């Protein structure tokens, strides 16, 4: 669905942000992109729907080049971005007006706009706040409104750029659960975060450092890679526990579907066997 070919991009001061990036993202895939601050992951996100355009190489979305200005509207119908701070995306006085903004710019009929707004409100479970100002909502609710505003555009691909970094743990989990449900419904997901705990549901993880891709693979392979700490990243707590147990002669297998409860059950099972 999206292909990056030898993409490079420098900051205005000349510092490289992306260096010769090559990525292919398939329709329906769940991609996690991670790296410490300054690794280039957010700059990469802005390239995926043409908010930034490469200085070298190209980004293709369903064959459309983001460098072709005439294709940008079509590209942005297909690829939507939810940012770290939802308030940067609010344009309406009420939640309902905010959600209607995108479809109105697509010149859709009022009946279709109403259907999309109602559907998006039902998806995020915030129908009772439709007449509230989005700026009066909690951080988690505001992030869900920003997501709903993108959903009214009905994109095939959703990019989430550090969307939980300003949320409390419970709100963050709620947003992650909605991302998971969207993927189950067939949406292509690109989820960007420095928190590796949030990437266990991904099909594939890409690790960036200084504008380059330095690791890529399944969650099982990437999240257990010993080089993560040298890249300034902290492995998920379950993987760290599994590694410590392994060092003491207890091999507990970890999978992307592992939860704290299932992991604890496996440990108990192993000890009961002995």
Swiss-Prot record:
Single annotated GO MF: ATP binding
Function recorded in the entry: ATP-binding (A) component of a common energy-coupling factor (ECF) ABC-transporter complex. Unlike classic ABC transporters this ECF transporter provides the energy necessary to transport a number of different substrates.
Species name: Methanosarcina acetivorans (strain ATCC 35395 / DSM 2834 / JCM 12185 / C2A)
Localization per record: Cell membrane
Assembly and binders: Forms a stable energy-coupling factor (ECF) transporter complex composed of 2 membrane-embedded substrate-binding proteins (S component), 2 ATP-binding proteins (A component) and 2 transmembrane proteins (T component).
Gene: ecfA
Similarity remark: Belongs to the ABC transporter superfamily. Energy-coupling factor EcfA family.
Protein name in UniProt: Energy-coupling factor transporter ATP-binding protein EcfA
Cited PROSITE patterns: ABC_TRANSPORTER_2 (PS50893), CBIO (PS51246)
Membrane topology: Peripheral membrane protein
Domain of life per record: Archaea
InterPro entries registered for this protein in UniProt: AAA+_ATPase (IPR003593), ABC_transporter-like_ATP-bd (IPR003439), ABC_transpr_CbiO/EcfA_su (IPR015856), ECF_ABC_transporter_ATP-bd (IPR050095), EcfA_1 (IPR030947), P-loop_NTPase (IPR027417)
EC assignment: 7.-.-.-
UniProt xrefs under SUPFAM superfamilies: P-loop containing nucleoside triphosphate hydrolases
Enzyme class per UniProt: translocase
GO CC terms: ATP-binding cassette (ABC) transporter complex
Positions that bind ATP: 35-42
Keywords from the named record: ATP-binding, Cell membrane, Membrane, Nucleotide-binding, Translocase, Transport
């Amino acid at each position: 669905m999206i292909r990056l070919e030898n993409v490079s991009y420098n900051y205005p001061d000349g510092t490289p942000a992306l260096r010769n990036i090559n990525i292919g993202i398939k329709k329906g895939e769940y991609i996690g992109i991670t790296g410490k601050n300054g690794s280039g992951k957010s700059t990469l996100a802005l390239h995926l729907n043409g908010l930034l355009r490469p200085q070298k190489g190209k980004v293709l979305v369903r064959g459309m080049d983001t460098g072709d200005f005439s294709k940008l509207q079509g590209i942005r119908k297909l690829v939507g971005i939810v940012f770290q701070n939802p308030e940067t995306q609010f344009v309406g006085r009420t939640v309902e007006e905010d959600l209607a903004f995108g479809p109105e710019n697509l010149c859709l009929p009022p009946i279709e706009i109403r259907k999309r707004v109602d559907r998006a409100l039902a998806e995020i479970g915030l129908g009772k706040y439709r007449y509230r100002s989005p700026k009066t909502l909690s951080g988690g609710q505001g992030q869900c409104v920003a997501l709903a505003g993108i959903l009214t555009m009905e994109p095939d691909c959703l990019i989430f750029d550090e969307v939980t970094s300003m949320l409390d743990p419970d709100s963050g989990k709620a947003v992650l659960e909605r991302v998971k449900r969207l993927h189950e419904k067939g949406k292509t997901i690109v989820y960007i975060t420095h928190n590796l705990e949030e990437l266990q549901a991904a099909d594939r993880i890409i690790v960036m450092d200084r504008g380059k891709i330095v690791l890529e693979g399944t969650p099982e392979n990437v999240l257990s890679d010993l080089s993560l700490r040298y890249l300034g990243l902290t492995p998920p707590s379950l993987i760290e526990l599994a590694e410590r147990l392994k060092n003491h002669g207890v091999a507990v297998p970890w999978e992307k579907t592992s939860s704290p409860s299932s992991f604890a059950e496996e440990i108990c099972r192993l000890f009961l066997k002995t």
